[in-house]
Amino acid sequence: MTNLRKTHPLMKIINSSFIDLPAPSNISSWWNFGSLLGVCLIIQILTGLFLAMHYTSDTMTAFSSVTHICRDVNYGWLIRYLHANGASMFFICLFLHVGRGLYYGSYMYLETWNIGVLLLFAVMATAFMGYVLPWGQMSFWGATVITNLLSAIPYIGSDLVEWIWGGFSVDKATLTRFFAFHFILPFIIAALAGVHLLFLHETGSNNPSGLSSDADKIPFHPYYTIKDILGVLLLILVLTSLVLFSPDLLGDPDNYTPANPLNTPPHIKPEWYFLFAYAILRSIPNKLGGVLALVLSILILAVIPLLHTSKQRSMMFRPFSQCLFWILVADLLTLTWIGGQPVEHPYIIIGQLASILYFLLILVIMPITSLLENNLLKW
């Protein structure tokens, strides 16, 4: 009798994705982040569902409903902080996952990569709208500043902003629709993640060498299931440590003050995972230019496959490209730091230089270096 997992219509999909999937024998721990992102998404959907049972999306009661969750609901504080810090863990895994893709040339799987870029945009949109929901000072002013950026779009800008707001300022209508979108988007993300996996399994996983691994494949289960479980345990360890010891470490104290349209906080800044993009936005004095740079800082990922000039896929055997990759990482960390600083000397010029370097590295320096490496290898 044939095994049920190989014949049952539903079971065989799971079987071919997580059990009998042929996987390269040499993929390192950098390949764990896909499964960790799946776990993060499940944690966020579950904690978010329980939060939504107690949250009210009304400007008068939103802030106090979050207070109620933390004080009166059984383990409400735990659910709330798991959700807030779960978002941080989500982005840490996302950045490492994208970084892995850049380093090892995984972007050569075009469909998988482009859906990944789409997923990144969707997660960023979801996180932004989620940050608005507690209706603290930083929620309100963050929403005001970021939605206002759309007014830089010529001709339709101001109408578009008022249409998104549902009025002439960020108010009840805005909060209600942000809650609706924040609830539905994670399910769209889950569906997109399914398509992401579908396209990945068409080609099979890449591996650190960037060479074909067809000659040396091993079954996903038990080898990579056990490896993924270790990754998940480490993720849960870090998340629970953060939640139980310093839940507000990554948050903004201003968000513990109820939203007040008449009082602007001295430094408006987004959550830490948006600071690099925020620094790029601020480094350009022109509003439309800043918005374009902001969008392009993420959208640039979509053109990376076109900029691949090396004859090798991975950076594993390309020391010059490796150096540039780590300079890019350092540059992004610098931008993240600058995004959290006030707009004054010397932070302005550092931010501008880091922003220029970011685009130069990806668009010019790295492709030229790859060509140089080809010549050094006489390819």
From Swiss-Prot:
Membrane topology summary: Multi-pass membrane protein
Residues annotated for heme b b562 binding in this entry: 83, 182
Bilayer-crossing regions: 33-53, 77-98, 113-133, 178-198, 226-246, 288-308, 320-340, 347-367
Keyword Zinc: no
Cofactor binding notes: Binds 2 heme b groups non-covalently.
Keywords (A to Z) from UniProt: Electron transport, Heme, Iron, Membrane, Metal-binding, Mitochondrion, Mitochondrion inner membrane, Respiratory chain, Transmembrane, Transmembrane helix, Transport, Ubiquinone
Gene3D superfamilies membership: Cytochrome Bc1 Complex, Chain C (1.20.810.10)
Organism domain of life: Eukaryota
Residues binding heme b b566: 97, 196
Main location, first listed in the record: mitochondrion
Binding, a ubiquinone: 201
An annotated GO BP: mitochondrial electron transport, ubiquinol to cytochrome c
UniProt cofactor(s): heme b
CDD domains cross-referenced by the UniProt entry: cytochrome_b_C (cd00290), Cytochrome_b_N (cd00284)
Sample GO molecular function, one term: ubiquinol-cytochrome-c reductase activity
GO cellular component: mitochondrial inner membrane; respiratory chain complex III
Pfam family for this entry, one: Cytochrom_B_C
Location of this chain's protein in the cell: Mitochondrion inner membrane
Biological role: Component of the ubiquinol-cytochrome c reductase complex (complex III or cytochrome b-c1 complex) that is part of the mitochondrial respiratory chain. The b-c1 complex mediates electron transfer from ubiquinol to cytochrome c. Contributes to the generation of a proton gradient across the mitochondrial membrane that is then used for ATP synthesis.
Subunit structure: The cytochrome bc1 complex contains 11 subunits: 3 respiratory subunits (MT-CYB, CYC1 and UQCRFS1), 2 core proteins (UQCRC1 and UQCRC2) and 6 low-molecular weight proteins (UQCRH/QCR6, UQCRB/QCR7, UQCRQ/QCR8, UQCR10/QCR9, UQCR11/QCR10 and a cleavage product of UQCRFS1). This cytochrome bc1 complex then forms a dimer.
Protein family membership: Belongs to the cytochrome b family.
Note: Heme 1 (or BL or b562) is low-potential and absorbs at about 562 nm, and heme 2 (or BH or b566) is high-potential and absorbs at about 566 nm.
Protein name (record): Cytochrome b
Top-level taxonomy: Eukaryota, Metazoa, Chordata, Craniata, Vertebrata
